[in-house]
């Protein structure tokens, strides 16, 4: 049976930027951000070495939100380059201001749909890690097809990972956690990682405001990690 990538749909959110955010965006975005909102299949693959100005391990974070985890994990591993993808401009602006404040040099950003980025901008076997933290669970059954992590998406991610590369996910939605586990374990190129598995990147992440709120509501966070087979 053919695998199909999920239908792309996003919830509406306020996206107005503050005056300070607009100023920072105008000054820094041309240097460390690109827009993939206007999607075209003829887009060129990213040259990450040219974009970052060095050749090193690269991690892609899907749906970075306001960038709390992105910033902390990039600061923890300054020798690893991070590409943060987010469809909401306001979240990227918040991250951009934090990058400017803390003078972090190993983060780049893409404004657009992560599925498009993975399909057309990221080359096969080019990433050391893909992070998907708290993707929208789309809890209604009729909306499950919109969930980002589907068998076809996991297959695409596995193709973009280098051998030994890492898929790191987290969710506070129990049904989605079961689905993610099933899809990840069902991907032939991936094997489940545990505390004894040697990984090329850190999987230590900060607790975000969203996660704290979820825990206070009694939700259990499930963290799932896979390593691409050599």
From Swiss-Prot:
EC number in record: 2.1.1.33
Pathway participation: tRNA modification; N(7)-methylguanine-tRNA biosynthesis
Database matches in CDD domains: AdoMet_MTases
Record's catalysed reaction(s): guanosine(46) in tRNA + S-adenosyl-L-methionine = N(7)-methylguanosine(46) in tRNA + S-adenosyl-L-homocysteine
Residues at the active site: 136
Any single Pfam family the record assigns to this protein: Methyltransf_4
Family annotation (PANTHER family): 3-DEOXY-D-MANNO-OCTULOSONIC-ACID TRANSFERASE/TRNA GUANINE-N 7 - -METHYLTRANSFERASE (PTHR23417), PENTACOTRIPEPTIDE-REPEAT REGION OF PRORP DOMAIN-CONTAINING PROTEIN (PTHR23417:SF14)
Protein name as it appears in the record: tRNA (guanine-N(7)-)-methyltransferase
């Amino acid at each position: 049976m053919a695998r199909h990538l999920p239908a792309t749909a996003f919830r509406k959110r306020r996206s107005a930027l503050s005056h300070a955010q607009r100023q920072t965006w105008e000054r820094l975005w041309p240097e460390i951000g690109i827009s993939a909102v206007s999607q075209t299949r003829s887009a060129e693959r990213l040259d990450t070495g040219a974009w970052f100005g060095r050749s090193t391990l690269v991690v892609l974070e899907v749906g970075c939100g306001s960038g709390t985890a992105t910033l902390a994990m990039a600061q923890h591993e300054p020798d690893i380059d991070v590409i943060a993808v987010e469809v909401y401009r306001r979240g990227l602006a918040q991250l951009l201001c934090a990058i400017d404040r803390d003078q972090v040099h190993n983060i780049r950003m893409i404004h657009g749909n992560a599925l498009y980025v993975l399909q057309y901008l990221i080359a096969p076997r080019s990433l050391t890690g893909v992070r998907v933290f708290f993707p929208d669970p789309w809890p209604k059954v009729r909306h499950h097809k919109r969930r980002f992590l589907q068998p076809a998406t996991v297959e695409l991610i596995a193709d973009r990972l280098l051998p030994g590369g890492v898929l790191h996910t987290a969710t506070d939605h129990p049904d989605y956690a079961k689905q993610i586990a099933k899809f990840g374990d069902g991907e032939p190129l991936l094997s489940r990682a545990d505390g004894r598995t040697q990984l090329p990147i850190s999987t230590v992440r900060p607790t975000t405001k969203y996660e704290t709120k979820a825990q206070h509501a009694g939700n259990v966070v499930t963290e799932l990690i896979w390593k691409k087979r050599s």
